């Protein structure tokens, strides 16, 4: 069974989020095309996502020294470990994010801080860091008000690609839902085009899944 982890990072409901609407098209098509696919959806604004703070850094230091964690430290690193476990178990990642000031929302960065973990998803060698995840791929569905594909201002997509490649996930496909603010009279056309691309991609991915 192929496991899909669908992660969205937008406090808006689906009907007000273009990236979520396109992501829902991808996920629903994926499940319709291949019943063996299991999807777990997480909206990062609806769950507890732990940032790296003083307690987390203290806990990491105690792991190395063997000291006991405080209850607060244990709870916080436990939250991060829960996200990490879901991430490691998945075969396919679907990320739906808006662009906010050239990046994605802070909660998405907090999620990545939970899953880029030395000894779990990558390790250090004398030749440098090596990703530990194999045979996984990712889809990034990104909503932007302007046109940012292929520009240096799209830090979010570039960062996500580099972060995933760092842990061994080098197959990343981006579906851009872009230009809604720049071309408000073409919103329906833009979203429909992105949904068509997402649907075609989902059929391709579903067809490649082996049970």
Curated annotation (Swiss-Prot):
Q: Which UniProt keywords apply?
A: Flavoprotein, FMN, NAD, Oxidoreductase
GO MF terms, alphabetically ordered: electron transfer activity; FMN binding; oxidoreductase activity, acting on NAD(P)H as acceptor; oxidoreductase activity, acting on NAD(P)H, quinone or similar compound as acceptor
Which protein family is named in the record?
Belongs to the azoreductase type 1 family.
Chain's role:
Quinone reductase that provides resistance to thiol-specific stress caused by electrophilic quinones. Also exhibits azoreductase activity. Catalyzes the reductive cleavage of the azo bond in aromatic azo compounds to the corresponding amines.
Q: What is the lineage of its organism?
A: Bacteria, Bacillati, Bacillota, Bacilli, Bacillales
Co-factor binding comment = Binds 1 FMN per subunit.
Q: Does the keyword tRNA processing apply?
A: no
Which parts form a coiled-coil structure per UniProt? none
What does the record give as EC number?
1.6.5.-, 1.7.1.17
Q: Which residues bind FMN?
A: 17-19, 99-102
Quaternary structure annotation from Swiss-Prot or TrEMBL: Homodimer.
* UniProt cross-references to SUPFAM superfamilies, sorted A to Z: Flavoproteins
Q: Which PANTHER family match?
A: FMN-DEPENDENT NADH-AZOREDUCTASE 1, FMN-DEPENDENT NADH:QUINONE OXIDOREDUCTASE
- This protein is called FMN-dependent NADH:quinone oxidoreductase
Q: Which cofactor does it need?
A: FMN
Record field: catalytic activity = 2 a quinone + NADH + H(+) = 2 a 1,4-benzosemiquinone + NAD(+); N,N-dimethyl-1,4-phenylenediamine + anthranilate + 2 NAD(+) = 2-(4-dimethylaminophenyl)diazenylbenzoate + 2 NADH + 2 H(+)
Q: Which pairs of Cys residues are joined through disulfide bonds in the record? A: none
